[in-house]
Curated annotation (Swiss-Prot):
Gene behind the chain: fbp
Top-level taxon in the UniProt lineage: Bacteria
UniProt binding sites for Mg(2+) 1: 89, 110, 112
UniProt name for this protein: Fructose-1,6-bisphosphatase class 1
Source organism per UniProt: Cronobacter sakazakii (strain ATCC BAA-894)
Cofactor: Mg(2+)
Length: 332
């Protein structure tokens, strides 16, 4: 049995940014995940369910667990003095850690993806993304350090809190998964160098918004539903409503996750920096693909901290197919 800590140290030689700082940073995220795991498991017993009554910068009501997870991860990262600053879906602006100007890295995170599912005991997750800062070490970080294209990520990953808690991450040398053993308090290696299956037969989308989708996406959904033995259609529809949970299932089984633009959200709804970029990095490292329907997600240069984007991620051929439909059936 190999623990996450042992694995990270063992694999340091495989990536160019191997330093003790990055290892300690991943360890801090691991600690934050353990704390969130502990409290999610007793969510119905303590007063951390439901809405907080506070709205974030996007005008969305924050759940109590959103704020709890954000504070716990922020504290875990700040305590190690190895992160110069963070950006979070739950914070209006970047958070600069005073006294950490010497640190090389910044972290972007969605502390609790799918938090509205907690009340009904459905899987949720944490998403994180790590970049090497571009401003000089020794100075406070600025917005420039956070508005980097996803191709510049040093590491990314997610934690899925479900029937078991799993941490999945990449440093650009494959995707590896670890299952949390609460009796020992450690994450243990369960899958190394994960890969998307070459073909998939599952599509994950909120079809309740069908009427609002672009024509190309509507045509793709109909394609998924048509019978064709050569392509193993019709495909199966599976949608949990938590990006982490839907992505994790499709990574294991083969499939595509779709969150297109809609009439009410013409720029898409998922955040480029906190959701799309880290999941795209993981997807590509696992042999999959991620796109906004027209271009590679990791090539997009962000222009704002909470920028949104349409998102299609999963088995490469399935993402290619939806891109083809979007090209062939443009909206007027």
């Amino acid at each position: 049995m190999k623990t996450l800590g042992e694995f990270i140290v063992e694999k340091q030689h495989e990536f160019s940014h191997a330093t003790g700082e990055l290892t300690a940073l991943l360890s801090a995220i691991k600690l934050g995940a353990k704390i969130i795991h502990r409290d999610i498991n007793k969510a119905g017993l303590v007063d951390i369910l439901g809405a907080s009554g506070v709205e974030n910068v996007q005008g969305e009501t924050q759940q109590k667990l959103d704020l709890f997870a954000n504070e716990k991860l922020k504290a875990a990262l700040k305590a190690r003095d190895i992160v110069a600053g963070i950006a979070s879906e739950e914070e209006d602006e970047i958070v600069v850690f005073e006294g950490c100007e010497h640190a090389k890295y910044v972290v972007l995170m969605d502390p609790l993806d799918g938090s509205s599912n907690i009340d009904v005991n459905v899987s949720v997750g944490t998403i994180f993304s790590i970049y090497r800062r571009v401003t000089p070490v020794g100075t406070p970080v600025t917005m420039e350090d956070f508005l980097q294209p996803g191709s510049q990520q040093v590491a990314a990953g997610y934690v899925v809190y479900g029937s078991s808690t799993m941490l999945v991450y990449t440093t650009g040398c494959g995707v590896h998964a670890f299952t949390y053993d609460p009796s020992l308090g450690v994450f243990c290696l369960c899958q190394e160098r994960m890969r998307f299956p070459q073909s998939g037969n599952t599509y994950s989308i909120n079809e309740g918004n069908y009427i609002k989708f672009p024509m190309g996406v509507k045509k793709y959904i109909k394609y998924c539903q048509e019978e064709d033995k050569a392509t193993q259609r019709p495909y199966t529809s599976r949608y949990i409503g938590s990006l982490v949970a839907d992505f994790h299932r499709n990574l294991l089984k083969g499939g595509i996750y779709l969150y297109p633009s809609t009439a009410s959200h013409p720029e898409g709804k998922l955040r480029l920096l906190y959701e799309c970029n880290p999941m795209a990095f993981l997807a590509e490292q696992a042999g999959g693909k991620a796109s906004d329907g027209k271009q590679r997600i990791l090539d997009i240069k962000p222009d704002s901290l909470h920028q949104r984007r349409p998102f299609f991620v999963g088995t490469e051929q399935m993402v290619n197919d939806v891109e083809r439909f979007i090209r062939e059936f443009p909206d007027a």
